[in-house]
């Protein structure tokens, strides 16, 4: 029984993303791991190819896709063997706060850059009582 109902569009997206990873990510994963950083150009290539913030509305340059596009990105990234290009943190954890809570002016200012990879978001938090600093 198939739980996730992928459409033909989803499968085509998966194939495109897999080819992108084979060309633009996997060959460099060890180099990035040793350097301790993923170059900004990798984010920009991923964004310009349409693989960042897949759920962001086309009004801001996004795909306007459903959640399954994000699932595909996560699934395919797991096969690369790299840990640095954590696009799901950017696309699926941080950016949704902007889409849900930012004013229209802030959405117009930041979302296009998030989608294109010109802006890379992050999250930082602290729980002083439990001494957790992420």
State the predicted function of each range.
Residues 26-37:
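C-terminal helix-coil-helix/basic helical segment that borders enzyme active sites and/or dimer interfaces
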Residues 132-133:
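Conserved small/polar residues in nucleotide/adenosyl-binding loops
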Residues 9-23:
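A non-catalytic, amphipathic alpha-helix used as a structural packing/dimerization or gating element
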Residues 128-129:
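Acidic, proline/serine/threonine- and glycine-rich low-complexity intrinsically disordered segments
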Residues 1-9:
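Intrinsic disorder at enzyme termini
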Residues 48-108, 112-120:
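Internal helix-loop-helix
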